[in-house]
Amino acid sequence: SDAQGNDVTSALPWRWLVRHPRHEVSKGLCYGRLDVPAQPEDTERAAQTLARRLPEGLVLRSSPRQRCQALALRLHALRPDLVLQPPEAWLAEMDLGDWEGRLWAELPEAELTAWTEDFGHYQAGGTGESVGAFLARIEAGLRAERTQTDAQVWITHAGVIRGIHWLLEGRLASS
């Protein structure tokens, strides 16, 4: 259920949620929407594993970020029976605004404090998404998916997967 008590998952068929492979970023770097590549060997390993384990004929959707797109394209090359769809913006990771590409340790303490004190509403990095806006984007994507009857695999990000789980578990209804 969403914050208004509406069921966002009624008649939602099977969805496999896959996090992108390990990325190539410096330790401590703040990134969300930042388009960083996945490590090629990890992308190949993940694609091979998924190709062996996923059922036939799934619809294949992914975030537009290259760390997800690379896996989707490689998986589709190995499994042409998967129905590759254009990237879905709602599957992208949270936009952390002006913090993107900077080291967490170098971010202004006052901004981080303001963010943690109003996590649901404060725009990350001053120009990015609030957690509430991020979850609303995911919820809108889930609502649109209710009309899709095919089983699907979504290649996305850890934050999106957590958000989907929170929404499906109804953990946000009281907040």
Regions found by a protein language model. Give the residues of each.
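Acidic, low-complexity terminal tails and accessory targeting/binding regions
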Residues: S1-W14, R52-P55, D81, Q85, ...
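Generic structural signal for well-ordered alpha-helical scaffold segments
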Residues: A47-A51, L135, E139-R146
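Phosphate-handling substructures
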Residues: L78-R137
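Short beta-strand scaffold positions
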Residues: S62-S63, A136, I155-T156
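Amphipathic, non-transmembrane alpha-helical scaffold segments
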Residues: T43, R65, V131, L135-E139
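Active-site-proximal alpha-helix that buttresses catalytic centers in soluble enzyme cores
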Residues: P13-P80
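Short, solvent-exposed loop/turn segments at secondary-structure junctions
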Residues: R22-E24, Q66-R67, A92-E93, A158-I161
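Active-site-adjacent alpha-helix immediately C-terminal to a catalytic or transition-state-stabilizing loop
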Residues: L12, Q69, E139-S175
